[in-house]
């Protein structure tokens, strides 16, 4: 089961809470609430399910590939997390207001640079009508409705304001938009694998009009996953033939691969699920990169084969250092980066772009209660 970023958001929001406490006082050992019983999944409904849900964890994730009017290329990822107390679904009247964490990364391919920033906030954000209507995390905003998604993220030297229009229907991962694992809980999960995007990028003293393609993921549920050596590799690939590929490889608490699965989405939006253990997907890591910031060794370069689809591609980062270290503790650090794709499909050349997410490679420091 793919439970991307659950540890990241919990670590980030835990960090926010610890920052507000007196550091001279001991931090009590947390009393984790048990996961809720796994319910029977219900059919997703839009626009209602674009908006927030009363579950332990939820996020809206975007990664994109942009060009300015001069042809210069950029990659970005923008994600907002919502965390609720599972015992009362974030009832602020009982002192359990929802917590929010947001992260933004920008890769400037011409300058071979990667910038990043984070924001945190807490408190109820009432929604009027279906969808997600201007969720705020400090000075960043996000809105999501079936016909239009938008966000605004600003840092000291970068501002990206985007409008994104879906060009395909929602892709329900695992065919029904729901996955469950034996020990880690359950999650609803759908993607909008190709959105037409346009907006404004302010980079230093330059203001640039940008456009391109975006991948969006939305997940919510009752789940949790441990950090190093547990973790995952996730791939969101957009091919130039109009199809998309999602791949997830998860590792258990012993660092062993326990699942490899994904989906192939046709140009018309038809989704073909690739189930764990089916033998329909082969993922091989080639090479590694060691972070000068954390000492973590990340995979760097992959070969993917889908024999039934006669698809074979190589995936390579466009910039090696796309590690996200703007949050602490170390369990919240991960690699999220823009990649280039080259290969063949049915004997014909195919290229593409994508984003890869790598978690569980940084050995965390002991937490305050240890």
PLM ranges: what are they?
Residues 22-370:
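Structured soluble/peripheral alpha/beta segments that form catalytic or ligand/cofactor-binding pockets
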Residues 1-9:
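Bacterial N-terminal signal peptides that target proteins for export
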Residues 16-19:
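C-terminal motif of bacterial Sec signal peptides marking the signal peptidase cleavage site
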